[in-house]
């Protein structure tokens, strides 16, 4: 269940990058 939060963090970073574009 440690991979779940890790994926969310990665997704959040990608979302932030897309929002900046």
UniProtKB/Swiss-Prot annotation:
The keyword Ribosomal protein does not apply. Keywords: Amidation, Neuropeptide, Neurotransmitter, Secreted. It is found in: Secreted. Residues 1-21 are annotated as: Disordered. GO terms for biological process: chemical synaptic transmission; neuropeptide signaling pathway; regulation of heart rate; regulation of smooth muscle contraction. One of its GO terms (cellular component) is synapse. Disulfide bonds: none annotated. The modification Methionine amide is found at residue 21. PROSITE patterns: TACHYKININ. The keyword Secreted applies. Transmembrane segments: none annotated. Belongs to the tachykinin family. Tachykinins are active peptides which excite neurons, evoke behavioral responses, and contract (directly or indirectly) many smooth muscles. Is a potent vasoconstrictor and secretagogue that plays a regulatory role in the central control of ventilation, in particular, the heart rate variability (HRV). This is Neuropeptide gamma.
């Amino acid at each position: 269940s440690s991979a779940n939060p890790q994926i969310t963090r990665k997704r959040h970073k990608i979302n932030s990058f897309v929002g900046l574009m």
